[in-house]
Every structure is written in C-alpha cells, then in structure tokens.
C-alpha cells in the first residue's frame, strides 16, 4: 500500500513489524517517536530517566521489556526453561516476602503446588453437534505458563470450562492436582453489579481487603489496575471494555490461586497494562493458562503453547508444544511445511456415535 496509514492499536507485534512512527498520548501530552515499537521502548526509557524518580517504576518495566527485545531467540528459550526449574526458589521467596507493592499489577502467591498440577489424557469434547477436541493429552508442569491459541469458536473457552467443572468431558481423563487452587477470569465478565462503583465491586466497601494471604488497602489495590482517584467511583455499568477487563482481573487475581485460567485477558488492554500484566505473570510462583491472540505476550511470557491445528479432515486436532510462540511457529513449519504458517478457514467435524 503506497498511502499513509494511521492506526490506533495496542498490538505490539503489529507496532514492531509495521509501524514507522509511533505517537503516544501520555497524561495529556503527545510524544512522537520515529521507528517501531522496539525503538520506542529505547527512546522512552531515556525520556523517563530525564524525568526522574516519579516514573522509576515505569522505567524499570520498560527496561525489563527492552532486555527481552534485545535477547536472542535462544536466550528467550533458555529463560523460559529456567522459569520451569525455579518454582521452589520463587515460591520460597514469595513466602519470605509476604508483602505486595501495588503501584504495578502484582499477583499474590497461592498455596504451594505439589508434583501434579494438571494432567490431560486423550480428552474428547464436543459442543452443539460439533467435535472440538479429540485425543488431546498434555501435562502442565509447576511454574508453567501456557498460551492457548486458535481461531474463535474452536473450543478454547470450552476447554477452560471442562477444567473448572462447568462442562463435562465426552471422553478421556482430566486430573487436577490436590494442591491446586483455581482462579478463573471469564471471557464474558459476567456477575458484576452495574450499579456499584468499581471500587465497591472489588472491596465490598471495605478499606482493607485480603489479597491472597496479604491484607492491604483496597484503594491501593484497585489503583494498581489503572484506576486512580475519581475513576474508582465510576459505576461498573458504564465502564469501557478495557476497564471491565481490568476490573475483572482485579477481582480474580485477589483470590490467591496457584493456577490461573485467563480467558482473553489481553483484550482491550492498553500497552502499559499489558506490560504490567506480563511482568506480574513472570514473577508469579505458580501456573497460568492464558487464551490470547497477542503474539507479543505469547513470545514474552509463554513456556508452552497449546495450539489448535485443525484441518478439513481433522478439525478437532490440537498440539502441545514446549516453548514460546516464536519457537512454536518454527516448529510448525518444520513439521507441516511452509503452508502451515498461512491462515485458513475453520471447518468443523460433526459428532458421531460409534
């Protein structure tokens, strides 16, 4: 395309691969940056250093993301594997600290995980006359962060509902470990009273709330999700999509689970909140299974990928892979050939009874 394009987006993968200029609106000011998203991170980090300590937390977050951008694919994979080996160390550190600083999103540690987290064996599941999952097996290790990817309607949310017991399996076995405490963020974000303020929804009107195993000021906790000052008094019924997503994250993460099921938590989130959520997951001593279309998020955070690889003949086929999204895509091309990287229409197989 030879013309100019102005795109409003929070998709960092798109910004890094397509954008030549980035214009950021920050606290009433417009800051132009020449270059892609990686260049933006470098330039903004320098600007925040000049602005001083008041932006120290943001500068640290940008520095962490920039270090990841500069690392090689091999370095990223090594870091992902190191996380899986560090569960005991991270859990012990969380128990020693028992303090949360909620200027940024932080996820409270849950109970210690045992040797079994989640084991799936030959899962079979259909819905509305269609076969969605057929023969899926995987084992989720402690400290694993799984990115679940695939087009809408292929069974990602249905899989979550089978894990939490809202949907029965048609076949196979799904074993949830005895030490697992589930926290689930519903894609539909239902059950929120539209007449309450968002602070009341999170706090039940209490000045102090229990966040995992830590008691803390409720307004400070709510502020960590981007709701500052008067924003906390907004009625829940008038919130935008991104605001409702942040509110639901706040509600769920305060439960203190050690296995998080996050159904498209990255939808409608701004870049700063996305980065804050990524850092929180990377520091979290526990497991997370995340349905998302955000490729940057999948590259930076995921230790495993659960990918829908349906075909015309087998539209209910899934593939379990250890590694991030970039590694998975290379593996997919090696296994299935160059055409595997191209998107194709979704087809479904009708359920049949033997």
Specify the residue positions occupied by each region the protein language model found:
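Intracellular alpha-helical coupling/juxtamembrane segments of multi-pass membrane proteins
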Residues: 43-84, 90-97
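ABC ATP-binding cassette signature C-motif
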Residues: 1-56, 102, 106-354
